[in-house]
Amino acid sequence: MNESALNPNYLFHPFVKRFPGDPEHVRNISDIQQLEKYPISERFPCQTVTDALFIAAKKYQHARAMSYLPNGRADDVLQSWSYLEFLEQCIGAANLFHSLGIESDHSVAFLLPNMPEMVFGLWGAQAVAISTPINPFLAVNHICGIVTETKTTILVTLSPDTNPSLFEKALAVKHNTTHTMTLVTIGTPCEDAIDWHTELKKQPFNRYLFNRQLTGMETSAYFHTGGTTGTPKIARHTHRGAMINACQMLIVGPTETELDTKSKVSLCALPLFHVNAIVVSSLTSLLNGSELLLAGQQGFRNKALMSDFWRIVERFKVNFFAGVPTVYAALLEQPVEQHNIDSLFYCGCGSSPMPQVLIKEFTQRTGADICEGYGMTETTACASTHYYYGDRKVGSVGMRVPYQHIRAVHLDDNGQIIKECDCDEVGVLLIQGPNVIPEYKQAFANEQAWPEPGWLNTGDLGKFDADGYLWLTGRQKDLIIRGGHNIDPLIIENTLVSHSDVVMAAAVGKPDAYAGELPVAYVTLTSGATLSADELKQYCKDYISEPAASPVEIYITAELPMTPIGKIFKLPLKHDVIVRFVRELIQALDDTLDFSIDIIDDVSTGNIVSINFAATREKMEAVASQLQQELDKLHFQWKCTFTPVLAEQTVLES
């Protein structure tokens, strides 16, 4: 442990160090540049999460590190661990894995819901080997691919009496992989696996049974990415990358002095197989001495948690939680005003763009600030965010975190850089920094991922304004993001073309005010086929393992747009589904209106949906406010031109 834990020159000491000339509060890019005058090795000295847990235990000792609501209800009997007890559980888990013979270059995979054992296990595994959290909803073949690629020799899951389907899935994974893998279960002991709690009791909790000298650049974890419903890419995380990213967020957030005046309780209800929950919610909480409140096994998927959420905030004085746009929209359907939630002052949002009207309504009704950020598995977690003491530009995703850089560029068809984008010019986003992963585990995933050494091609589109704020405008890649749930269109397309009557298929995202996007598909059929769209939708439900990926609409068409070299050209389909959506929206408001819809491609702002109406003034005034209210919920630029009869042309736009 580092004695600098007692040094007053450290902010969140000893994780973030202060130097002469540092700004008191980080407000803008100039402040970031001032911080960057000192080397990152001096600014963020701690090298590994394993070291950080020891340092935090020494500093915070008997303060609560983590609490658990087993059912995600406000009246649950709380289970709690102090910082010292938290460290002991992580040490015990590491010793358990060591006793099962794991090697340092092997991994422990976790097929679990959100529960304390997963947190202890993840960081215990990183002390002795590598941790690999896996989405329990993935299909068996995808999980088999992950555990094979990551050299998983221990798989932790729930016992058959606790969750029969999850245990059967884990058993199927074990039987369908060629290498030896030990199954460890949590719950009632069973014959087919080693029992977690029985073996844990045999381990010492005050020392490691192994001698491993960790360095910051060693692999700490493998996180799968690229969509929960397609072939997952595996990102290699390092110990140093995790520590740096957590510290990057701490230094642009509220100061330790300000946090000490709050209740310091961070609620976590996002899935622990995702970097947001592990790094943004959990690791930063432990580094700043907060209490991590784990809100039930299913997190935000649990309807009981959603209905009880504001009671939980009130009872436990929660001051921070992170969510996705669909979560925030659902929480506003609950009665907020009848609860005292003054403790809540800071919320995080990522995964997909959040409608501005939703941000404003949430802040107005709760008094809490939503901090929109941008990041991905490949940046460990966070790449840009709104600084706590900086100005808010609602609709942007803030500014870059320190010691990391983001560029907007134009790329050619081979993924090579053509030019740097000007201010307010849309381009593909590239990211470089110490929090960016060194590589994907699979060779195929690294192809065209790095246009320049160290610079990751995110596949996202965005622009920077004159103040350095980043504005996302779309995605170069074709992932469909449904309520923060990444859907690879290829899995939909492959399923559809597996039908004997389907020739070609293309899946795209349809705008949705609640989920952001919903998957839809366009298909062409064989000559003479009489297959209906409803039959194809049922076919997808039968063969796509993740329900969220099943298309909500299927459009049967005579042909699909193609590029000159014979590839399906999706841009016209993306435009078509937007036009269909807006047309349905307008007709639902007034089916007698005369209008036209066009998609305008603008290099500086991205696509603009242009709607032109020819109507009487009475009809125009009747529909204008309703239409604006509905369009403002969506995350695309729009422009409505109303041409009233016998009146001047008027314009309404976002």
From Swiss-Prot:
Pfam families: AMP-binding (PF00501), AMP-binding_C (PF13193)
Presence of keyword Nucleotide-binding: yes
Record-linked Gene3D superfamilies: 3.30.300.30, N-terminal domain of ligase-like
BP-aspect Gene Ontology terms: antibiotic biosynthetic process
Catalytic activity of the protein: ATP + a marinolic acid + CoA = AMP + diphosphate + a marinoloyl-CoA; ATP + a pseudomonic acid + CoA = AMP + diphosphate + a pseudomonoyl-CoA; marinolate C + ATP + CoA = marinoloyl-CoA C + AMP + diphosphate; pseudomonate C + ATP + CoA = pseudomonoyl-CoA C + AMP + diphosphate
Entry annotated with the keyword Ligase: yes
EC number in record: 6.2.1.60
Pathway(s): Antibiotic biosynthesis
Keyword terms, alphabetized: Antibiotic biosynthesis, ATP-binding, Ligase, Nucleotide-binding, Plasmid
Top-rank lineage group of the source organism: Bacteria
Disruption phenotype annotation: The deletion mutant can produce both marinolic acid and acyl pyrrothines, but not thiomarinol.
GO molecular function term, any single one: acid-thiol ligase activity
UniProt record similarity statement: Belongs to the ATP-dependent AMP-binding enzyme family.
Role this protein plays: Acyl-CoA ligase that catalyzes the CoA acylation of pseudomonate C, leading to the formation of pseudomonoyl-CoA C (PAC-CoA). Also shows high activity with pseudomonoyl-CoA A as substrate. In addition, can activate acetic, octanoic, 2,4-dodecadienoic and 2,4-decadienoic acids, although with much lower activity. In vivo, is probably involved in the biosynthesis of thiomarinol, a naturally occurring double-headed antibiotic.
Name of this protein: Marinolic acid--CoA ligase
Species of the source: Pseudoalteromonas sp. (strain SANK 73390)
